From Swiss-Prot:
Gene that specifies this protein: psbC
Protein name, per record: Photosystem II CP43 reaction center protein
Subcellular localization: Plastid, Chloroplast thylakoid membrane
Organism placement in taxonomy: Eukaryota, Viridiplantae, Streptophyta, Embryophyta, Tracheophyta
Molecular function GO labels: chlorophyll binding; electron transporter, transferring electrons within the cyclic electron transport pathway of photosynthesis activity; metal ion binding
SUPFAM superfamilies: Photosystem II antenna protein-like
């Protein structure tokens, strides 16, 4: 009887129902992996693996282009983006394309161009993927040594890491260039309710930029998610760009130190596990960012945050009842606390009622009404502008609380709109994917460590007690 694992390879046993099935000339016997393990069969075939990765990039870019055009085709300019289930157009609008004051869409042509460019790019990537998967050399080491590699070659691996870091740094600089020189980006804090503007006065102070990293992630601190002005965001990308580029150059020019050689497992599956861990962290951070941050993700495009919708409801009814003659400064609510206004634990004047829990919300429609000690009573009586009333009424009825088959919005709000907020979609999907990637990290890290420790062949079954027990029947 043939042994289950290949003598040529050193991977886990994969027991197949049909061990003789051959796909693309690579069967389980020669690769150690079954057909359904996909790219695992290509672990040591750098040329074929390149094809798989390029084709995968093509699929990703094709989705981006096709979905982009789908959203353009369905877009109704009269309705806010967040009511239309859009997740790509809000990103383009945030970059300042096609929008004007208040986030109003003036021109959808840039969105169309974006979709077409992604489709064309995906065709190029798709062709490259098919070429390298089917026609190109199986391995790159002989013909193209610069692009070839061996997984355990630590120096080559850190060189590849360095190249990736430089590309990421250049990507960060692209956003900086867009904000500084190519039309600017959308600033939800621009006076009068948001506008596209060039970011001129960058925040480059390391104490400010790295201060975000040192903040607590909880409550009113909010770690990097608490960033609330574009100068800090674009300045942060300047720092990130330089750090990534210089880190990349460092990794290209140096070899791993002894402690790093000892600390890491140096195999393809280990690198996969490290990458999955990083993507998992990114997913969890993105989840919090899109859920809580209304500067990087402006509410004009993504809908209000949960706290923002709640505070907007309190503000809307304060405006209504003040018009009807209520004295909002002294009216008592059912609990004996202020009905419209109360004090926070640190003494600021905040909105009363259930929304007190969201007292540290900052939003561009609300900040003009604050003074040095929180909400300013005289401003609430005299300075409320029509655009602030309109926007808060709109946000009140569009809380990001809907489920797929129910009415969206606050359960007690009779005017709530039946929709699911893009914030709900994006934060939930990134949390779920972040979690799955974390599980994938644990799985592949465990396999990589087992292989490195030398017991990847599985357990010796010869002495299992079950082999010596009587059959159940």
């Amino acid at each position: 009887m043939k042994i289950l694992y290949s003598l040529r390879r050193f991977y886990h046993v994969e027991t197949l129902f049909n061990g003789t099935f051959v796909l693309a000339g690579r069967d389980q016997e020669t690769t150690g992996f079954a057909w359904w393990a996909g790219n695992a069969r290509l672990i040591n075939l750098s040329g074929k693996l390149l094809g798989a990765h390029v084709a995968h990039a093509g699929l990703i870019v094709f989705w981006a282009g096709a979905m982009n055009l789908f959203e353009v085709a369905h877009f109704v300019p009269e309705k806010p983006m967040y009511e239309q289930g859009l997740i790509l157009l809000p990103h383009l609008a945030t970059l300042g394309w096609g929008v004007g004051p208040g986030g109003e869409v003036l021109d959808t042509f840039p969105y169309f161009v974006s979709g077409v460019l992604h489709l064309i790019s995906s065709a190029v990537l798709g062709f490259g993927g098919i070429y390298h998967a089917l026609l190109g050399p199986e391995t790159l080491e002989e013909s193209f040594p610069f692009f070839g590699y061996v997984w355990k070659d630590r120096n080559k691996m850190t060189t590849i890491l360095g190249i990736h870091l430089i590309l990421l740094g250049l990507g960060a600089f692209l956003l900086v260039l867009k904000a500084l020189y190519f039309g600017g980006v959308y600033d939800t804090w621009a006076p009068g309710g948001g506008d596209v503007r060039k970011i001129t006065n960058l925040t480059l102070s390391p104490s400010v930029i790295f201060g975000y990293l040192l903040k607590s992630p909880f409550g009113g601190e909010g770690w990097i998610v608490s960033v609330d002005d574009l100068e800090d965001i674009i300045g942060g990308h300047v720092w990130l760009g330089f750090i990534c580029v210089f880190g990349g150059i460092w990794h290209i020019l140096t070899k791993p130190f002894a402690w790093a050689r000892r600390a890491f497992v140096w195999s393809g599956e280990a690198y996969l596990s490290y990458s999955l861990a990083a993507l998992s962290v990114f997913g969890f951070i993105a989840c919090c960012f899109v859920w809580f941050n209304n500067t990087a993700y402006p509410s004009e495009f993504y809908g209000p945050t949960g706290p923002e919708a709640s505070q907007a409801q309190a503000f809307t009814f304060l405006v209504r009842d003040q018009r009807l003659g209520a004295n909002v400064g002294s009216a008592q609510g059912p609990t004996g606390l202020g009905k419209y206004l109360m004090r926070s634990p640190t003494g600021e004047v905040i909105f009363g009622g259930e929304t007190m829990r969201f007292w540290d919300l900052r939003a561009p429609w609300l900040e003009p009404l604050r003074g040095p000690n929180g909400l300013d009573l005289s401003r609430l009586k005299k300075d409320i502008q029509p655009w602030q009333e309109r926007r808060s009424a709109e946000y009140m009825t569009h809380a990001p609380l809907g489920s797929l088959n129910s009415v969206g919005g606050v359960a007690t709000e009779i005017n709530a709109v039946n929709y699911v907020s893009p914030r709900s979609w994006l934060s939930t999907s990134h949390f779920v994917l972040g979690f799955f990637f974390f599980v994938g990290h644990l799985w592949h890290a465990g396999r990589a460590r087992a292989a490195a420790a030398g017991f990847e062949k599985g357990i010796d079954r010869d002495l299992e007690p079950v082999l010596y027990m009587n059959p159940l029947n």
